[in-house]
């Protein structure tokens, strides 16, 4: 990813050159602050380096350069990569209610309101780089929900047709570590019972 934060302990670094190397030039990478340099495999104007180490949590700097056989250094660059293998502290996330739950129970997630909001609870406060997120499309895309302390809220801006809608929730950090997931189906039913079906009180038993 472009943020250079990952939960993968084995890193592959990809890069590019603005022009192809000359016959007496090479691209190199250093993992130790420039003390030693390793020749990169270059194809055209792109290069790729597989770091053979198994990295633990921390920040690792990769330096690259272009150098010729005479030792003249041209272009240089450096990039810090953050390894984060630790999941967020919030081990649970729950969906507690839907606005205007008009079903027979006020907690059955059935409503006649076609514009809804959800609210729920986190098992622990989010840390820096942690996010509570919701997906409306089966996990294809995710949106951060609003969080205050241990409570979260989400307003669904759609006007929903009658049917069932599955809301997925998760807690995730910038590195992609997921600590909690849940899902909740909400039923939208705006259709009143058939008006041709009547109910009447006919008599009492003496």
Where are these regions (language model features)?
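Short beta-strand segments within Ig-like beta-sandwich modules, predominantly Fibronectin type-III
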Residues: 38-44, 143-149
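Flexible, low-complexity linkers/stalks enriched in Thr/Pro that connect modular domains
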Residues: 75-101, 180-206
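Aromatic/hydrophobic beta-strand junction motif of beta-rich domains
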Residues: 13-19, 118-124
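Surface-exposed, short loops/turns at beta-strand junctions within beta-sandwich domains
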Residues: 51-59, 156-164
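Short, solvent-exposed loop/linker segments at the N-terminal edge
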Residues: 1-9, 100-114, 205-206
């Amino acid at each position: 990813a472009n943020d250079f934060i990952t939960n993968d302990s084995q890193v592959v670094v990809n890069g590019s050159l603005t022009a192809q190397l000359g016959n007496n030039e090479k691209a190199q990478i250093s993992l130790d602050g420039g003390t030693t340099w390793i020749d990169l495999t270059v194809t055209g104007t792109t290069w790729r380096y597989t770091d053979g180490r198994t990295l633990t949590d921390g920040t690792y700097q990769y330096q690259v350069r272009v150098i010729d056989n005479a030792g003249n250094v041209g272009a240089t660059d450096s990039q810090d990569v953050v390894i984060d293998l630790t999941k967020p502290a919030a081990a649970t996330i729950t969906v507690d209610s839907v606005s205007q739950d008009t079903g027979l129970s006020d907690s059955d997630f059935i409503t006649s309101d076609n514009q809804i909001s959800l609210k729920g609870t986190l098992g622990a406060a989010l840390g820096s780089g942690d996010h509570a997120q919701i997906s409306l499309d089966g996990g294809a895309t995710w949106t951060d929900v609003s969080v205050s302390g241990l409570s979260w809220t989400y307003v669904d801006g759609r006007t929903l047709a009658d049917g069932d809608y599955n809301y997925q929730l998760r807690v995730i950090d910038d590195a992609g570590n997921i600590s909690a997931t849940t899902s909740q189906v909400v039923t939208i039913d705006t259709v009143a019972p058939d008006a041709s079906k009547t109910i009447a009180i006919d008599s009492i038993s003496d």
